[in-house]
Amino acid sequence: MCIRDSNNSYFAEGITVLDQSIIMLTWKGEQAFRIDISNFSIVENFSFEGEGWGICFNGEFLVMSNGTSQISFRDPETFEINHTIQVTWDGQPVPNINELECVGKEILANVWLQDVIISIDSISGNVQYFVSPTSISSTQGTNSNEVLNGIAFDKSSGGFWITGKNWTHIYLIEISYQETSSEIQETSGLNRFSEILIISIILLLPLLVIFRNKNEPETPNFKDSPP
């Protein structure tokens, strides 16, 4: 096992694997590093403007968040921005996009200081659904230094590992969802297809699932109870 101490002038943030390298962001240092995965030596560095929060690789681009509602898609060789999308919920920007995990055309992310994981369409930026693992996170602390802040896809099981700042455990969960029938849609009075989230915990822990559908646009707050 290799252990590398990072430069104390940098606050290390999100990382992702790219081929035989690890790409690591710095929070306010405006630097990203390419690190050899075999020995953790720095082989290249990139400059960027703004803050670095989360990063993942979707097979074509490095996908990066900066704590706003914007997500940038960057060239994996040069780190130059190819294009950006804005994350929205019912047409309203969702700020504080943090940790990212790319799975196919979907981007999973946590929203800083909100106890949720959201699914983002990588083309439109629309939030497709979200889940709130409060039954897990509530056992790990409730202050700003103990928030949900880690998502990793487990290809072998199809599940997701989640954890948070200063958490003592990581948890393997499975997330799936399905659309409701038109009959349910009509009786509920909703004017668009809604989604029911079905989630099961592989480690035999309950995971609270929250479904929310709004008719009136407002600043997104995923801690609100469903209307």
Residue positions per predicted region:
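Secretory targeting signatures
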Residues: L100, S181-P227
